[in-house]
Regions:
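An N-terminal, globular interaction/scaffold subdomain
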Residues: 2-129
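Surface-exposed polar/charged interaction patches
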Residues: 31-34, 52-55, 116, 176, ...
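Short, compositionally biased low-complexity segments enriched in polar/charged residues
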Residues: 35-67, 119-133, 194-206, 261, ...
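Edge/loop elements at the starts and ends of beta-strands within beta-rich repeat scaffolds
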Residues: 69, 140-142, 208-213, 217, ...
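Extracellular/lumenal glycan-associated surfaces
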Residues: 74-81, 143-154, 212-225, 274-283, ...
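Extended intrinsically disordered, low-complexity coil regions enriched in Ser, Thr, Gly, Ala
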Residues: 80-108, 157-178, 223-243, 289-308, ...
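C-terminal structured domains
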Residues: 224-372
Length: 372
């Protein structure tokens, strides 16, 4: 049974368990520390999840947690794919009386994957990730989520001449949310790709329709702080390079950072001043290149290293360290499910001339195929 068949089996079973994702989350609340997500914040997450189908529990979902903020807030993320129950839910909503901007954007994107733009599917496959601003939103007005594509079918290594594929992914995201195409924005994103070292890869493309326009890029695989600095200098990133290099050097002194990822915001005017740093300490990659979860990382050394940063909340670091666990068996009406959970990544945020934020990203995913 391949990964898509396993997801389909799990979705069929979840559909018999309930209707919306909030019903599933209600059963999982006991495993999430109140230091990470408070009760009032949890209710806001549930309000969002009530608009999503329970079948999305068969693909990774989880939370973005601000480790620098004592308030127990969280943003929410979930995954779906064209051609299965989760994607069909949004297509049906777009055709029906409950159509909304999000379902229409998803339907337009899936139409490109399935028929209109086969080149897109050859790069990113047929999955999509959504990121909902909840804890970070001022008013929680139900605005559109961020939409993210990952090039899982074709790895976009630097130096491989794949700038056309980069443009294909950008075009798809821009058009699906109804933005006007901007040639200079597209060229700027391709310029970032062309500046990548050969052994780095373009890991994801994202847009946030409810924020100021930009293309969010994730680039993984930088080996040293010096390599990061040189890359950012080539692109004329408008921040303080010494702050970036110093932050990575401090972490290297406390623990062995094997690779580093970067998050950049790219627009028609060039690169934005906010930069995300994703240190990776030790990783085992998944056997299936189409896996929804890249691999298993030993995050504890990095969490221990972050304790040395005075602005990081110690209680949240402790709670995050407790999050990684072995597979858990859940018992439901249709039988057993296996739940996998863990830390997906940790990101440090540099804004211009200072390191000011740390965020933890945790995931959960259920399988009803492993348990039958």
């Amino acid at each position: 049974m391949d990964i898509f068949e396993a997801i389909a089996v799990t979705q069929d079973r979840l559909a018999q368990e309930g209707a919306d994702l909030a019903e599933l989350l209600g059963h999982l609340r006991g495993g999430i520390s109140s230091a990470l997500i408070g009760e009032r914040e949890w209710e806001r997450v549930l309000d969002c999840a009530r608009e999503l189908p329970i079948t999305m529990g068969a693909q990774p979902f989880g939370f973005e947690l601000p480790l620098h903020d004592r308030r127990p807030r969280a943003d929410f993320g979930a995954s779906l794919a064209s051609g299965n129950r989760s994607g069909d839910f949004f297509k049906e909503r777009a055709r029906g009386g409950e159509s909304d901007e999000t379902s229409r954007a998803i339907t337009r994107l899936f139409a490109q994957m399935e028929a209109g733009n086969p080149a897109l599917r050859e790069v990113v496959g047929r999955k999509l990730m959504l990121e909902y601003d909840i804890g970070s939103s001022q008013d929680g007005d139900g605005s559109m989520p961020g939409l993210f594509l990952r090039p899982n079918e074709r790895t976009l290594f630097g130096g491989a001449g794949l700038d056309h594929d980069v443009g294909t992914a950008v075009d798809a995201l821009v058009s699906c949310v109804g933005w006007e195409p901007l040639a200079v924005e597209r060229r700027n994103v391709q310029r970032v790709y062309l500046a990548q070292p050969d052994d780095t890869r373009m890991d994801s493309f994202g847009v946030f329709p409810s924020r100021e326009r930009s293309i969010r890029l994730a680039i993984m695989g930088f080996e040293t702080p010096g390599e990061v600095r040189a890359f950012l200098a080539r692109l004329h990133w408008p921040g303080d390079l010494s702050v970036v290099e110093a932050a990575l050097t401090r972490l290297n002194e406390r623990t062995g950072v094997e690779r580093t990822g970067l998050n950049l915001d790219v627009g028609a005017g060039g690169l934005g001043p906010t930069l995300g740093l994703t240190p990776i300490v030790k990783q085992r990659y998944a056997d299936d290149p189409r896996s929804w979860i890249d691999g298993l990382t030993d995050w504890q050394p990095l969490l221990d290293a972050l304790r040395g940063e005075e602005w990081v909340v110690a209680e949240k670091i402790q709670a995050l360290g407790d999050w990684t666990s072995k597979p858990t068996t859940l018992f439901a009406k249709t039988g057993r499910f296996i739940m996998l959970s863990g830390i997906h990544h940790i990101k440090l945020v540099v804004a211009g001339d200072r390191l000011e934020q740390a965020k933890g990203y945790i995931y959960m995913v259920l399988s009803g195929a492993l348990a039958v």
